[in-house]
Amino acid sequence: MRGVNRVMLIGNLGRDPDVQFLEGNIGVAKFPLATTETFKDRGGKLISQTEWHTVVLWRGLAELAQKYLHKGSLVYIEGRLRTRSWEDKEGNKKFATEVVGDNLIMLDKRADGPAHPASHSTSQGDSVEGFHNQEI
């Protein structure tokens, strides 16, 4: 049986995307995304719980993020979990689990009119060979 590695998130950017262009002018954007769940505890009190996710977008999606996304933007991200490892300057092994997005829908309302759920996806959501284990 094959495994399934699929993540779907709706949340707000915690800061403006950090966009870098790697060798070959390949864009990569990285940003924190907050998702908040609200539920009632046993006493009926509303509780909000926020989780932070690191999102990575490649190529065209990175360029869209750079152009249109900013701190507070509401987005739908679909992608895969990816855990990468590297050694820091002191030789310590570090790990990071990230959501590598391959589908992005901007859910913010436009300032000049109705909501504009602009959808963008890529079949190239994977990291680029040679770059996936670097600290970006």
Named regions from a protein language model:
Residues 1-3, 21-24, 44-45, 92, ...:
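Acidic, gly/ser/pro-rich intrinsically disordered tails
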Residues 9-49, 85, 95:
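Core FKBP-type peptidyl-prolyl cis-trans isomerase
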Residues 11-13, 33, 71-82, 101-104:
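OB-fold and OB-like beta-barrel modules that bind single-stranded nucleic acids
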Residues 14, 20, 58, 82, ...:
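Conserved positions in beta-strands of structured domains
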Residues 51-53:
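Short amphipathic alpha-helical segments
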Residues 55-94:
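Beta-rich strand-turn-strand
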Residues 89-106:
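OB-fold/S1-family single-stranded nucleic acid-binding modules
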